[in-house]
From Swiss-Prot:
MF (Gene Ontology): nickel cation binding; unfolded protein binding
Keywords assigned: Chaperone, Cytoplasm, Nickel
Places the protein is found: Cytoplasm
Organism: Acinetobacter baumannii (strain ACICU)
Function field: Involved in urease metallocenter assembly. Binds nickel. Probably functions as a nickel donor during metallocenter assembly.
UniProt cross-references to SUPFAM superfamilies, sorted A to Z: Urease metallochaperone UreE, C-terminal domain, Urease metallochaperone UreE, N-terminal domain
Name this protein carries in UniProt: Urease accessory protein UreE
Any GO BP annotation: protein folding
């Protein structure tokens, strides 16, 4: 079994690669097993540096390259009569820290009947659909720099 251990920022245009479709849940993990479309089993033991986004490349130590694509999965799709109503739904779902995928005409989240009822209560339409899930990463994703000289901490006399 090939074990993929490296994340690649980019590959050369002539680089050969295979592809694998993974759910959002799997793409959040640094260690997983999966099967290629050909049925070949692969494994991953990647650095813990964030989510594998659709279109990401990973490689084995031997140089085999694999493109990771978002696999269609069961999601709740929120649509509205107006853009403002869709914005309100995004606000309410965001307040619940739900992984949320935004498009100009719809919101998508993982199945949750309580959230679906809440959104329907706001007057929006919720349907189930199969769609690749690529939620927003959030304001603090990949956020790892030092705040020791942050003006906000200095202003409020916060000590680390």
């Amino acid at each position: 079994m090939k074990i993929y251990t490296q994340r690649l920022e980019d590959i050369s245009p002539d680089q050969a690669f295979e592809t694998v479709e993974l759910t959002f849940d799997t793409r959040q993990k640094s260690r997983f097993r999966a099967a290629l479309a050909s049925g070949v089993d692969i494994g991953a033991d990647l650095p813990r540096t964030g989510i594998l986004r659709s279109g990401s490349y990973i490689a084995t130590q031997e140089g085999d390259v694999l493109r990771v694509d978002a696999k269609p999965e069961r999601l709740m799709k929120v649509t509205a009569q107006t853009e403002f109503d869709l914005l309100k739904a995004a606000y309410h779902l965001g307040n619940r820290h739900v992984p949320l995928m935004l498009t100009p005409t719809a919101l998508y989240f993982e199945p949750d009947h309580v959230l679906a009822e809440m959104v329907e209560g706001l007057g929006l339409t919720v349907t189930e659909t199969d769609h690749p899930f690529e939620p927003e990463s959030g304001a603090y994703a990949q956020h790892s720099h030092d705040h020791r000289l942050s003006p906000i901490k200095v202003l409020h006399h916060v000590h680390s």
